[in-house]
Structure formats: C-alpha cells, structure tokens
Curated annotation (Swiss-Prot):
Protein's UniProt name: Phenylalanine--tRNA ligase beta subunit
Catalytic activity of the protein: tRNA(Phe) + L-phenylalanine + ATP = L-phenylalanyl-tRNA(Phe) + AMP + diphosphate + H(+)
Gene: pheT
Domain B5: 423-498
Subcellular location: Cytoplasm
InterPro entries reported for this sequence: aa-tRNA-synth_II/BPL/LPL (IPR045864), B3/B4_tRNA-bd (IPR005146), DNA-bd_dom_put_sf (IPR009061), Fdx_antiC-bd (IPR005121), Fdx_antiC-bd_sf (IPR036690), NA-bd_OB-fold (IPR012340), Phe-tRNA-ligase_IIc_bsu (IPR045060), Phe-tRNA-ligase_IIc_bsu_bact (IPR004532)
CDD domains in the cross-refs: PheRS_beta_core, tRNA_bind_bactPheRS
Gene3D superfamilies assigned to the protein according to its UniProt record, in alphabetical order: 3.30.56.10, Bira Bifunctional Protein, Domain 2 (3.30.930.10), Ferrodoxin-fold anticodon-binding domain (3.30.70.380), Nucleic acid-binding proteins (2.40.50.140), Phenylalanyl-trna Synthetase, Chain B, domain 3 (3.50.40.10)
Organism of provenance: Rickettsia conorii (strain ATCC VR-613 / Malish 7)
Enzyme class: ligase
Subunit composition and interactions: Tetramer of two alpha and two beta subunits.
The keyword Zinc appears for this protein: no
One GO MF term: tRNA binding
Keywords: Aminoacyl-tRNA synthetase, ATP-binding, Cytoplasm, Ligase, Magnesium, Metal-binding, Nucleotide-binding, Protein biosynthesis, RNA-binding, tRNA-binding
Length: 818
C-alpha cells in the first residue's frame, strides 16, 4: 500500500515529521517498508525554459534548443518530439548523474553541434517505466528552482506492508484513523455534501446471488465532460504508481486508495437494458456437481463447454466458467465482479453519461477468480480482503460529488441499490484483568475504553466488564484476544514490561520430542542427506497415486490448482525434487524432510521421510563403484531407530498389514512395534517412477514419529563396557519355518535366547524354493558365542545347539535344515 504525506493530511491533522509517522505506523502493526523522497533524490535537477528551437543541420530527428537556465543561456541537442519553444522543462546540468542508466552528463559534441546538458523525460528520472517525450512543467515553474515541487514530487511516499486481515488499512482514511488513535494527530471528520437527485434511473438492477454479492449500488450521472483530472489528483495518483487516464477513471482510483472501496465507472450509453450480477452460466440441477469440496477440486481442472469471453480492460481475453461472478447486461459480460471491468463498456474521452458503481463481493469468490485467471488489480486486492459494507454508499456519494466538481454539474439519479448494510456485531465481554493476564499491560477500564473508542469500537462499561462491539470495517475482530491485540498495539508493545521466562522442564515431553527430531536431522545430515521443506499441499492427481482420495482433504480455497489437496505422505514432494534434479543431470542425491502427513480431517501425523538414489561411490582406479541399494537405506534408518531405542530387525512387520502400493511389492517392508505401524522402507514401485519421469532406482523410508514411543531420558551411571578375554565361537544354523513367520521376530527371539553366551546374530540367507516343502522358507543365521568367565568347550557348544533347535521347534515349529 502506497500513499503520500499530503494524501494522509487530507484526513489527519498532524504536525508530525515523516520519521515520526513512519515509526508510529510500524509500531501499530502497519510496517513501513520504505519512505520514498523523490525531492531529495532529484534535488539537482532544475527548471529551465526553451526560448528558441531550430533543426539540427546534420540530423533530421535532432533539434538545437536554446535553453534559459539560472546560470545563463545554454545550447542543448534534443531528440524529443515534444521539444518546442515556450515550454518549461527539466534540465540536467553537466556533472549530474541520470538515475536511469547511471551515467553522468558531460559537455559533448553531437553530430558536429555542442550540447551542454540534457532535457529529461520521466523514464530517464525513473518516474515512469516509459515516456513519449521530455517532461513539460506548468507555466508557474520558476527557472533555476528544483523542479520537484512543481511536479508534485516534494511529497514523501510511504510504502507499508498490510497484513491480509487489515483490509481497512488499504485506504488512507483507515491509516489516518489508526494514527489518530496512536496520538499522531486528529482524525478529520468527513464532510459529505448532500446530493440532490434530479431523476430516477430506468436502469434495472438484478442481483441473483446475494451471498456472492451482499451489496450492489450505483448512480447514473448524465451530461458530464470527461476532461483531464486536476493537477492535485494526477499528482497523487502518479506518486503511488497509478496511471492517470481521465477524470472519471481517476476519481474511482482515488476513492479506492482513499477509503479502500473499489469503484467502477461504466459508459452508460454502452450498457444495454439492465445490470445483472450473477454466477456465469449457472448449471441445471441435474448437471450439478455433488459436494462443495468436489466442485472446488475439479472445476478448474475439467474443460467446460458453457464458457463466455470477457474482453478485459488490460487488453486480455478470458474464458469464464460457472464459478465466476460476473456483471452483465443484455449484450453480454461487462466485468468480472470485484476483479476487472470489460473494455467494451469502459469510459473514453467522449463519455458523457456514466453508471457509477460501488459494490461488495464475496471475498473468496473474488480471490478464486483472480487467482485462476492470474489477474492482479487494486480492486481484487481490496475485495478479497473484505470491504466495509457500511461505508459503500458514503463512498458512492463522495465519488459523485468529486465527479460533479471536476466534470461539471450533470444530472444525477437516485441511488439504485440491492442489498443492505452489515448488521451490528455481537458484543464481547472484555476486562482489565483479562488484558493484564494475556499481555501484562495494566490499564484501567477508562483507559481501555478510550483506546477502543478512538479505533471506532462501540463500548459499554458495566462495572469491571466492558462490552465491546467491533466496527464494521474490522472483519478480523472476532475473539477477546483480537481486542487485547488492538489495545496492545496502540498502547505500545515497547511499553510492556519484560519478565523472566519460567525455567524449562527438561523432562517435558514436547521438549524431548523436539530434541529427538533435531537429533534425527543431525544423524541424517551426517550421513550426507540434505534437508528439504516442501508444501503441505499437493495436486490431487498426484495424491491419488499414494492414497485413496478423501473428500474432506480437498482444499476449499487452494493457493493454486496444483495445490488443492492435503498431502497423505511427504514422498511425492521428494520424488518431484528428484525428477527436477534428474532433468538437470544431477543423478546422485539424498534428501529428507520432517513434516505432517494427513490421513483424514482428524488425523495428522509427523513423519520423517528420506530418499536416496544414484551412486553410493563413483568408479575410480581402486573401485568399480556401485549404486545405492536398499541396505544402504536400511543402515541409515537403523541409526535413526537406534537413537529412538528401537531395532529395525526386531521391528520388521509381516503381520498381514498391506504394503503401500507405491512401494515395490517384494523389495520393501513395513516396520512396526506390536500392533502399532511405524512406517515402511524399501524400493519405490517402477510405475510411480515412470509417472515422475525418473529412470533410476529410488529407495525411501517413512517413519511415523508420532507413533514412536518417547523413551524417557535416563540419567545416572552407565554400565561399564567389558570385553571378554576368552575365545569367541561362531556357529551357522539354517532353520526351516513357515512362510507366515516374521524373520525379525525369529532373529529377536534368538538374540534373547541366551544373553550370557550370545553376542550377535547375523542373518545371511533367506531361501524358499523347490527344495523345500510348500509354504516353507529357510532362514540362515550366524551366531557369535562367547562366555565372560571361560573358554566354551565342545560340550557347551553342543548343548547350546541342542537347546536352541528345541526352542525354535517349540516356538516356531521350525526344524534344522540338513
């Protein structure tokens, strides 16, 4: 949002300096990004006067100008078409640097003629993106003085960042109201002259969708002269970057910037019949799409036959769908409501009769249409942040008065209106105790009431309670915390006393969870993984490859068509990154992300998802090199699981839970703890890779951190690490068991069979085939045996083998393979 100091002073009586105003704006939440002072930047450029002009003897397109300056007469070579005798211009003397191009003016000879300066255009001074000639100043400009005050540039420009909830601050009047509440000045009372209508408009108004357009007003004005706007208006608009077109259009822009109420002026002679506000091409009930979410999710993706064209003011043509709110007459579309007008009914220099519109439209519909067509206009920007419906008719009156004062006293109709003002909001019970509780600010009820009244709130004190009604322009005030924030920002955040924060409970579950996630990240980073952060939304087309789509997970108001669904897993986002990297010939990569995945509307889980692909090490004189495989991934997952106090081998789940369809059916597994599914790891299915245009193997793991047991931190002395001095023995066993038995469960059982002797159990083979009975598999393990107090004898080893075989037989109905 841009505005100038003089514009602010139209509504605020203040003697505060630019610096004081800027500091106050930032303090009340209207962050000042920049203060532009063109007068300071262009102070060396002065007013000059062209006394005589003649053609250049050696160049048809150049002219020799005799220029009067404060230091005397100069000859300047100029090629501008509008250069002529008798006009005041902007002079850059020798030694001055031109902003556009950053070059210094030197005395030069151009095609044999001396030139002692430069006559400047708006483009050269960075006052416009393009210009057709040199700047022409008003006749009252004094030769030798700085030109900025004659060109309206001696007016500092404030550039503020307005948050989406503060639609009321998109008008200079709203900003002035906040500054007055802060004590920077006194808010001027708006003086709106009563308009005497001279006729009743025959133009009928039909609003078919009151929810989409809660208020639409217009006034017909006849016999106007659409002449150029006065200097004060043109300067204001030019300083904030708005192109001046004609007085009729300039007034609507002025009202939009002054009060945050978008307006539009139609050429009344081009409007046929009445005005209708409706959703374009409403579908019949037998064709209606079932479910609002389904409509939102699919409307933008599917081609439609019932489309019409809007030839917009920006010169572009748009195809409309039934989701677009339009303004139309008998001849067709006359505008995309709240976004942009139609070129065919726009005002021109010859326009004498207008229809002046001031309306309020559904913010979500305006945002959706603007986003779908990628149209960014001041009207859209304000409409999608909600308009003060109770000020709309006042804005229409102010605009009407201004047009009549500039364009002549034309004939004015009565206001044509459909819709009503917004009803008063429900009061909220606020108190000084509540304010102190959540902000630490100690104020009495009278001080609280004074601040709120300055901001336009309606208050009623009942003892210790103050009933507060938010003003119509503050759509964001809905709860007590909002009121507390309003008081705090006007009172001053810098005045809130600082207090010492309470000591953190080191055994707090949230703190331990945060530390654990941080450790997971460090572990993977140490293994060469790069952390990424991706959007929690994704395309429903991608999502259906990874999970069954659920209606409640579609976004009603997506940021873009490609982000219309809440992600069921992080994996698609990582695969998209892999695909983009491969397109740039980057083949070796390892990524991870910690973030939410959404199962349904009530179930959200935090996942650690990692992905590797490419070469583990490259070919070199000492090695042929090899690519990543699933065991590399498993090793990295084991490090993470070990920190969480788990063993991956013990957590491999084969209890009948189906593997997600996006994993390779025989090269991936589920991991779990009891009946609790913790995630999956393995190779990604080739069909998924083909969809993402990935031509190399991808390995990934997903770990549900939410379901991971949070092991309480152990404090105290660790057990002493002891190494046996006696010889270790190794024995290989191959057991035949049923296919339904989990390998991890068998390994875990063997590990715990005799903890005094067993030091390690390593799985080295799994076999199933013709040499085994149907429904059976062979599991081969290497067991390291070692006692702490003696060397194991053959008797000890044979006894161990006998007991182990018997235990496997009893527990898993397994037999020793011959």
């Amino acid at each position: 949002m841009k505005f100038t100091l003089s514009w602010l002073k139209q509504f605020l009586e203040t003697s505060a300096s630019v610096t004081e105003i800027a500091e106050a704006l930032t303090a009340i939440g209207l962050e000042v990004e920049e203060v532009i002072d063109k007068a300071a930047e262009l102070q060396k450029f002065e007013v000059a006067y062209i006394t005589n002009i003649k053609p250049h003897p050696s160049a048809d397109k150049l002219k020799l100008c005799d220029v009067e300056t404060k230091s005397g007469m100069l000859q300047i070579v100029c090629g501008a078409r509008n250069a002529r005798a008798g006009i005041k211009v902007v002079l850059a003397n020798i030694g001055i640097e031109i902003p556009n191009g950053k070059f210094k003016i030197k005395e030069s000879v151009i095609r044999g003629e001396k030139s002692c300066g430069m006559l400047c255009s708006e483009e050269e001074l960075l006052l416009a993106s393009e210009s057709e000639g040199i700047i022409e100043l008003s006749e009252d400009a004094v030769v030798g003085e700085n030109f900025t005050k004659y060109y309206g540039l001696d007016d500092p420009i404030f550039v503020i960042n307005v948050t989406p909830n503060r639609g009321d601050a998109l008008g200079v009047y709203g900003i002035a109201r906040d500054l007055a509440a802060k004590g920077i000045g006194i808010l001027k009372e708006l003086e709106i002259s009563v308009i005497k209508s001279t006729f009743i408009s025959k133009m009928k108004l039909n609003v078919q969708d009151k929810e989409a357009c809660p208020l639409f007003t217009f006034r017909e004005i006849r016999n106007l002269k659409n002449k150029p706007s006065p200097d004060w208006l043109r300067k204001l608009l030019k300083n904030v970057g708005v192109k001046t077109i004609s007085s009729l259009v300039d007034v609507t822009n002025y009202i939009s910037y002054s009060f945050g109420q978008p307006m539009h002026a139609y050429d009344a002679d081009r409007i046929k019949g009445g005005i209708t506000v409706a959703r374009h091409c409403e579908k019949h009930s037998d064709e209606a799409i079932s479910g609002q979410q389904n409509e939102i999710a699919t409307a933008a993706l599917q081609p439609r036959n019932d489309v019409a064209k809007c030839h917009a003011l920006n010169g572009k043509e748009y195809l409309l769908t039934e989701n677009d709110l339009v303004i139309k007459d008998e001849s067709g579309i006359q505008g995309l409501a709240g976004v942009i007008g139609e070129a065919d009914s726009s005002c021109t220099d010859s326009t004498t009769n207008i229809i002046l519109e001031a309306a309020c439209f559904n913010a979500k519909m305006v945002a959706a249409s603007g986003r779908r067509f990628q149209i960014d206009t001041d009207a859209r920007y304000r409409n999608e942040r909600n308009i003060d419906r109770n000020f709309t008719e006042k804005a229409l009156d102010i605009a009407t008065n201004l047009i009549l004062s500039i364009c002549g006293n034309g004939e004015v109709s009565e206001v044509v209106k459909v819709g009503e003002k917004e009803s008063q909001k429900k009061p909220l019970d606020f108190s000084a105790c509540y304010l102190e509780k959540i902000t630490g600010i100690k104020l009495n009820i009278k001080a609280i009431e004074a601040i709120l009244n300055k901001l336009g709130f309606i208050t009623d004190v009942k003892g210790e309670i103050i009933k507060v009604i938010a003003p119509s322009w503050r759509h964001d005030i809905t709860i007590l915390e909002d009121i507390a924030e309003e008081i705090a920002r006007i009172y001053g955040y810098d005045k809130i006393e600082s207090i010492k924060l309470p000591e953190l409970d080191q055994d707090n579950n949230k703190l331990r969870e945060h530390k654990r996630i941080s450790s997971f990240k460090r572990i993977l980073a140490s293994k060469g993984y790069d952390e990424v952060v991706t959007n929690s939304f994704m395309s429903s087309e991608d999502a259906k490859l990874f999970a069954e789509l659920k209606e409640e997970l579609f976004l009603l108001n997506p940021i873009s068509i490609g982000d219309n669904y809440m992600r069921p897993t992080i994996l698609p986002n990582l695969l998209s990154i892999v695909s983009k990297n491969l397109a740039r010939s980057i083949k070796d990569m390892a990524f991870f992300e910690v973030g939410p995945s959404f199962i349904d509307l009530n179930t959200e889980a935090t996942y650690l998802t990692a992905i590797i692909s490419g070469s583990y090490n490259n070919k070199n004189p000492h090695s042929f090199g090899r690519g990543y495989d699933v065991f590399d991934l498993k090793g990295d997952l084991e490090l993470v699981a070990d920190y969480a106090g788990l063993s991956i081998d013990k957590c491999i789940a084969t209890n009948g839970t189906a593997l997600p369809q996006y994993y390779h059916p025989t090269r991936a597994v589920n991991i779990g703890l009891g009946k609790n599914l913790l995630g999956h790891f393995g190779q990604i299915h080739p069909k998924i890779l083909k969809y993402y245009d990935i031509n190399q193997e991808i390995f990934a793991f997903e770990l549900n951190i939410t379901n991971l047991p949070l092991i309480k931190a152990k404090f105290g002395k660790r057990d002493e690490f002891a190494v046996s001095d006696f010889q270790a023995n190794f024995r290989d066993y191959a057991f035949i068991v049923g296919q339904d038995h989990r390998v991890g469960e068998i390994i875990s059982y063997i590990n715990n069979f005799n903890k005094k002797l067993i030091k390690s159990v390593i799985l080295f083979d799994i076999y199933s085939g013709d040499k085994l009975p149907e429904g059976k598999k062979s599991i081969a393990v290497k067991i390291e045996l070692q006692a702490d107090d003696r060397t194991l004898s053959d008797t000890d080893l044979n006894s161990f083998s006998k007991d182990l075989v018997a235990a496997i037989s009893q527990k898993f109905q397994g037999t020793l393979r011959e």
